[in-house]
Swiss-Prot record:
It comes from the Archaea. Its EC number is 3.4.-.-. Probable zinc metalloprotease whose natural substrate is unknown. It is an enzyme of class 3 (hydrolase). This is Archaemetzincin. Disulfide bonds: none annotated. The active site is at 132 (proton acceptor). Zn(2+) 2 binds at residues 142, 147, 166, 169. Its cofactor is Zn(2+). Binds 2 Zn(2+) ions per subunit. One is catalytic, whereas the other seems to have a structural role. GO terms for biological process: proteolysis. Keywords: Hydrolase, Metal-binding, Metalloprotease, Protease, Zinc.
C-alpha cells in the first residue's frame, strides 16, 4: 500500500500508552502516523450547547478545519469531552472530508458510573480512532461482523467490534491508495 499520512492531534491530555497503541494499530496498515500535542488545547466555546452540555461536533470540526491546514490525507482530533450531532443523543466521533474528531468521554467506564479501566478505555479509543480514520480515507460503515467500520450506537457496540479492518475494507483502502498514487 502507498503510504498515506495521518495526523493525530490531541486537544486534551491523552495517556502516552494510548497514543502508542493508536500509532501501532494504524501503522500496521502501512499508514504513516504523526502526532501533534496541541498546546492550545481548547474547543470553541461557540460550539458548546449549554442545554445539552455537549459540543456540536459539526461546529467543532468546522472550526478545527479552519485552523489546521496541513498536508495530510487525514487529520484526526482527540478531545476528552462529549459531542453530538443533530438527530443523535451523542456521537463517539464524526468525520467531514478528511477531518475527524473523537470525543472520549463516553468511551470511559467512569461515564457509566463504573470502575475506571484504562485498558478497556485504550481499546475503545484505538477502535474509534481507527474507525474515523477509515471514514477519512473514504470508507463507509461495514456490515461484516467484527469489522472496525461497524457503526457503534452504544459503548457495548464498540466493545463488540475488533480494532481491525475486515478484508473488504482493507481492499478498498488499498485501491484508494493506488488511485491516489496515480494522481
Amino acid at each position: 500500500m502507498t503510504e498515506m499520512k495521518i495526523l493525530i492531534v490531541t486537544l486534551t491530555y491523552i495517556e502516552k500508552s494510548i497514543i502508542d497503541e493508536i500509532v501501532n494499530n494504524l501503522s500496521s496498515y502501512g499508514l504513516e502516523v504523526d502526532i501533534l500535542f496541541d498546546s492550545r488545547k481548547y474547543l470553541p466555546i461557540s460550539a458548546f450547547n449549554w442545554e445539552r452540555l455537549q459540543y456540536d461536533a459539526e461546529k467543532v470540526l468546522s472550526f478545527l478545519k479552519s485552523k489546521y491546514d496541513f498536508n495530510y490525507d487525514s487529520i484526526i482530533f482527540l478531545a476528552d469531552s462529549d459531542g453530538y450531532i443533530d438527530g443523535y443523543n451523542f456521537v463517539f466521533g464524526l468525520t467531514i472530508d478528511n477531518f475527524a474528531i473523537i470525543f472520549l468521554n463516553r468511551l470511559r467506564e467512569e461515564f457509566y458510573n463504573r470502575k475506571p479501566d484504562l485498558e478497556l478505555f485504550m481499546k475503545r479509543v484505538v477502535k474509534e480512532v481507527t474507525h474515523e480514520a477509515g471514514h477519512t480515507l473514504g470508507l463507509g460503515h461495514c456490515n461484516t461482523i467484527g469489522c472496525v467500520m461497524n457503526f457503534s450506537n452504544t459503548v457495548e457496540d464498540v466493545d463488540k467490534k475488533q480494532a481491525r479492518f475486515c478484508k473488504n475494507c482493507i481492499y478498498k483502502i488499498e485501491n484508494l491508495s493506488k488511485y491516489l498514487q496515480r494522481k
